A protein has these predicted regions:
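Catalytic loop of the DD-peptidase/beta-lactamase superfamily, centered on the K-T-G motif
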Residues: 11-167
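Single conserved hydrophobic/aromatic residue that forms the stacking wall/gate
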Residues: 1-5, 9
Length: 167
């Protein structure tokens, strides 16, 4: 059994150290433009980033990392018509697509407020930013090919946080 920090969970239910060759069949070429595919960082660093976003772009040190205008742009949904129809197929009920993020615009099936935004990782990670209540959630998982995480696990995580706050 290995205890190296680079141990990674693989679909075969085995843990093995990353020897630098792990690709899981997912390769990005130089001409692929994406703002987040392959984003790497620590859970702590990512959590601090999410916390800054839910606090108007100001981090825990008091330094501004993003302008309030940008946060408002994130909170605005831009999809309409067929674009919105395509986005709904992802299972994100009540959401529209905003400036690189999903944005909640219908709270019928969510306990979070309109304007909550975030994004999902290709391997199941989940980020939720609620600037209204100054709440951020970062759920880290790395399991490629587990689609139920987006439509079933993420919404439950979100709603459990809000249910806990109601008590």
């Amino acid at each position: 059994s290995s205890s190296a920090a680079s141990d990674v969970y693989k679909r075969q239910d085995k843990i093995r150290p990353d020897d630098g060759s792990m690709s899981d069949g997912f390769k990005i070429t130089e001409n692929y433009e994406s703002g987040g595919a392959g984003l790497a960082g620590t859970v702590d660093a990512y959590s601090l980033f999410a916390d800054a976003l839910c606090n108007g772009g100001v981090g825990v040190t008091g330094k501004r990392i993003l302008g309030e205008k940008m946060i408002r742009l994130f909170m605005t949904g831009y999809t309409t018509g067929i674009m919105q129809d395509d986005f709904v197929v992802t299972g994100k009920k009540g959401y529209r697509y905003g400036l690189g993020v999903r944005v909640l615009n219908d709270t019928a099936e969510s306990k979070s407020p309109v304007g909550e935004f975030g994004w999902d990782g290709a391997a199941g990670a989940y980020v939720m930013i609620d600037p209204v209540n100054h709440i951020s959630i970062f759920y880290a998982q790395h399991i490629v090919g587990f689609p139920k995480v987006y439509s079933e696990i993420h919404p439950v995580i979100r709603d459990l946080v809000y249910e806990a706050l109601e008590k």
